């Protein structure tokens, strides 16, 4: 339901049941729905000019230095490339192909492809866990080659309404409540490394 696709590769050995989860959607930033990629073969630190006027360089994107000499896909600037999470989906499908083609031993492997990750994990919330009875699950997302992320941030939303108490300056002692100072105090209580900008 809700566009969630689940599948199972039946195990051929006594191993834990694992799950791989990928999201199907890409970030919607009001660009073209049609992907317009640019393939740069044998990337040699050249400047990439996008149709929207932006330029991609190793100065603005130092992570590109790790990919010198490789073929790289970029967006032309008129669309989102969508590597998050299409790259992970292709990796999962390739991993399943390799396991099957080489008759590798494995326990049950469950797959879940969910929609609407970028807009509040709606697909993940709709995942029927009775169809995903795993011992361990891994979210496969867009990372650097060889990189494993073993923790993630969680975002939440809250609306805080602070009402102050106004008072005439002469009679404000122990009566006036400045809502800006109350808000500042609340913000100061948030752990520094868990704020959205981190």
Question: Where do the PLM segments sit?
Answer:
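A short acidic, glycine/proline-enriched capping/turn motif at secondary-structure boundaries
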Residues: 12-14, 24-28, 118-119, 145
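Active-site-proximal alpha-helical scaffold in enzymes
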Residues: 85-102
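Midchain, well-structured core segments that form catalytic/ion-binding scaffolds
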Residues: 32-34, 41-49, 54-57, 61-83, ...
């Amino acid at each position: 339901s809700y566009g969630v696709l689940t599948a199972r590769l039946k195990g051929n050995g006594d191993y834990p049941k694992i799950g791989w989860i990928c999201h199907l959607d890409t970030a919607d930033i009001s660009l073209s729905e049609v992907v317009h990629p640019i393939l740069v073969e044998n990337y040699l630190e050249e400047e990439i000019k996008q149709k929207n006027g932006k330029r991609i360089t190793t100065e603005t994107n130092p992570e590109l230095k790790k990919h010198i000499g490789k073929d790289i896909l970029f967006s032309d600037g008129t669309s989102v490339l969508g590597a998050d999470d299409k790259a992970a989906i292709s990796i999962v499908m390739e991993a399943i192909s390799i396991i099957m083609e080489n008759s590798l031993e494995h326990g049950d492997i469950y797959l879940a492809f969910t929609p609407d990750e970028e807009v509040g994990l709606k697909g993940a919330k709709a995942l029927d866990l009775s169809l995903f009875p795993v011992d361990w699950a891994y979210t496969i997302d867009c990372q650097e080659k060889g990189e494993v992320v073993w923790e993630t941030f969680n975002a939440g939303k809250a609306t805080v309404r602070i009402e102050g108490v106004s008072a005439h300056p002469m009679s404000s002692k122990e009566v006036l409540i400045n809502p800006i100072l109350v808000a500042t105090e609340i913000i100061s209580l948030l752990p520094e490394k868990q704020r959205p900008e981190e």
